[in-house]
């Protein structure tokens, strides 16, 4: 009798230990949307975006990247993914004296049979600019809802700094997910990452030609550092034109090294509007992904 009691206690203890180990192994969920390209331009450059400044979508890549916006900027991205998921992004920014303010959201809706129902990210950004130097910060809200309707939420911050030489070049540094405040259900796993980038206009931006290059290196928790190089080339005449782009390097979240190293894209220019397109053969979004977007900066 006593032996049976001891055996039952040992078995119960073992089961509790295994259950605790299983829960620890699962850990808090990592939002997939954080590794997705924030906008179509960055998608066409294999994720390089920290030094591609001047548009509303910078609220996700580099908060200080809003500084060149003189009045207003609006941006939107849409992708219908091969697994029937839908990814959308919207952002807006404007200037008040030496400050730029902006905000945006990323939303990923997965198929009905997925264990995860959706991912949502919302940011609010403030930037201070003096001369060619800008510093900015973003407050970021992230949530993941599973198929049972359980929502896990966290809050974090991004910071960034940019040094710009007129419209010729820009050197930018951004840190994503600095700190992690759990808001519900134990919070999310938000890996911190550092991004250092440089962009350079090889042609006068006021000429009819467009030729810009960028390079970016990123260091993220749990991943090897990656370096991406990108090139944009095109022509604009009387406000109308075409720009094509290509990016080469490891994509964000490519831990196994199975994603495409090269991405492609382009933009139709019509005054202050840019109609963007990007193609990624193999990415976290899926295989053969087409992304569409629009930017308007009057």
Regions found by a protein language model. Name each.
Residues 2-14:
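Bacterial N-terminal signal peptides that target proteins for export
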Residues 22-98, 179, 271, 278, ...:
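N-terminal, post-signal peptide beta-strand-biased segments of exported outer-membrane/organellar beta-barrel
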Residues 56, 168-171, 186-298:
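Outer membrane beta-barrel transmembrane domains
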Residues 85-87, 101, 110-114, 135, ...:
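Outer-membrane beta-barrel proteins
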Residues 86-175:
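Transmembrane beta-barrel wall of Gram-negative outer-membrane proteins
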């Amino acid at each position: 009798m006593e032996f049976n009691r001891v055996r039952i206690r040992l078995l119960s203890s073992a089961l509790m230990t295994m259950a605790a180990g299983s829960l620890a192994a699962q850990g808090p969920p990592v939002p997939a949307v954080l590794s997705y390209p924030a906008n179509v331009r960055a998608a066409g450059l294999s994720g390089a975006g920290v030094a591609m400044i001047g548009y509303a979508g910078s609220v996700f890549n580099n908060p200080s990247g809003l500084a060149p916006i003189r009045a207003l900027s609006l941006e939107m991205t849409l992708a219908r993914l091969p697994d029937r998921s839908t990814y959308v992004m919207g952002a807006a920014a404007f200037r008040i004296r030496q400050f730029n303010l902006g905000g945006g959201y990323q939303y990923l809706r997965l198929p009905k049979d997925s264990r995860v129902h959706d991912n949502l990210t919302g940011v609010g950004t403030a930037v201070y600019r003096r001369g060619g130097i800008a510093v900015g910060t973003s407050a970021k809200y992230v949530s993941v809802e599973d198929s049972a309707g359980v929502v896990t939420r966290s809050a974090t911050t991004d910071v960034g700094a940019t040094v710009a030489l007129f419209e010729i070049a820009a050197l930018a540094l951004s840190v994503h997910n600095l700190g992690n405040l759990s808001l519900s259900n134990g919070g999310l796993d938000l890996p911190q990452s550092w991004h250092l980038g440089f962009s350079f206009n090889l042609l006068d931006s006021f000429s009819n030609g467009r030729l810009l290059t960028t390079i970016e290196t990123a260091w993220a928790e749990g991943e090897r550092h990656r370096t991406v190089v990108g090139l944009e080339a095109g022509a604009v005449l009387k406000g109308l034109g075409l720009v094509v782009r290509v990016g080469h390097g490891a994509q964000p979240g490519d831990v196994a090294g199975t994603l495409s190293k090269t991405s492609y894209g382009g933009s139709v220019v019509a005054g202050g509007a840019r109609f963007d397109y990007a193609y990624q053969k193999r990415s976290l979004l899926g295989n053969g992904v087409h992304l569409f977007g629009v930017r308007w900066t009057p």
